[in-house]
Amino acid sequence: MSDAPLILLAAGGTGGHLFPAEALGVVLMKRGLRVRLVTDSRAMRYSGLFSADMIDVVPSETVRGRTPWALARTGLMLGAGTAKALALMLRLKPAAVVGFGGYPTLPPLFAARALRIPTLIHDSNAVMGRANRLLSKGVTAIATSLPGVLDRDPTLSAKTTTTGTPMRPAILAAAAVPFAPLAAEGPLRLLVVGGSQGARVMADIVPGAIEQLDPALQPRLVLTQQVREEDMARVRAVYDRLKITCELAPFFNDLPARLAASQLVVSRSGAGTVAELAAIGRPSILVPLPGALDQDQFANAGVLADAGGAIRIVQADFTPERLADEIAALAADPQKLTAMVTAARTVGRLDAADRLADLVVKVANI
């Protein structure tokens, strides 16, 4: 194993970037290859495939602001990160470097290109992220989760393969769990999440929506909600007053199993979340993160909504009244919930990690 080719996986330090990297790493290791992760310090919070001795942290900086000071700071950090990545690759001699988006991928991909090491980037969004766009012209190959992402650029489209989003083993296991159809007077298992870093808007809106539901529906709810520590007391107070059966926590380590157990999910629409909802096949109400230059979450949610597997609500329209109306309508129509399950699954790809691994092996020529 120590003589096996090494594949470096570069990813930003959030779940949306790390989880696909982890899923690919699992498949590559099963094929007898070695893997290491190059990322920023945030990744040390996540437990999974990559133990501490498999992680290399390089300096990086997200572009924040356009002032001369902000741009100079970003340039210095990226320069320092690239220098460290160059030294790392000269020592490790990887067969290929695979980037999964986020600004922490820039230094290792810049270094790999300078050393003529084969490179590949994967993008899970319906709209390619800014870091990947910066890298796209110089990499050997591109993989996307969804078709048509780069159709407007023939040069990039020619080296692009649609693989889907690699799924961790926990997601694949959850995808095998059958959906439990909603019984006419049975419990409604509602899961509310805000992405790997939480979302205050869920704490602001969801309790009010639950309060506005018909008193006959409230006792049927079995609610699991991701809530930031600073919002916990006020959210819990509402649910205690309404006598809602609920479990609240800042983060759920077993989120795939909770997705599988749910009958309706209310969530942001990051690429990873949308891909997991599609793979597992669960109905959802998606609230895209507003203000993004690329409107990537709006586009991601649109993929599931257009397929019939989700309801998309822009944040300006995400009020307690609107959410209560949507939950009540779905609770009154169990057949629609079941139809949304089937529709969501038409978007999911459970073989994405193997498809991406095939492309990595081809690019690395191993």
Swiss-Prot record:
Pathway: Cell wall biogenesis; peptidoglycan biosynthesis
Reaction catalysed by this enzyme: di-trans,octa-cis-undecaprenyl diphospho-N-acetyl-alpha-D-muramoyl-L-alanyl-D-glutamyl-meso-2,6-diaminopimeloyl-D-alanyl-D-alanine + UDP-N-acetyl-alpha-D-glucosamine = di-trans,octa-cis-undecaprenyl diphospho-[N-acetyl-alpha-D-glucosaminyl-(1->4)]-N-acetyl-alpha-D-muramoyl-L-alanyl-D-glutamyl-meso-2,6-diaminopimeloyl-D-alanyl-D-alanine + UDP + H(+)
Any Gene Ontology CC annotation: plasma membrane
Similarity comment text for this entry: Belongs to the glycosyltransferase 28 family. MurG subfamily.
PANTHER family with a match to the protein in the record: GLYCOSYLTRANSFERASE, UDP-N-ACETYLGLUCOSAMINE--N-ACETYLMURAMYL-(PENTAPEPTIDE) PYROPHOSPHORYL-UNDECAPRENOL N-ACETYLGLUCOSAMINE TRANSFERASE 1
HAMAP family, alphabetized: MurG (MF_00033)
Stored NCBIfam families: murG (TIGR01133)
Protein name: UDP-N-acetylglucosamine--N-acetylmuramyl-(pentapeptide) pyrophosphoryl-undecaprenol N-acetylglucosamine transferase
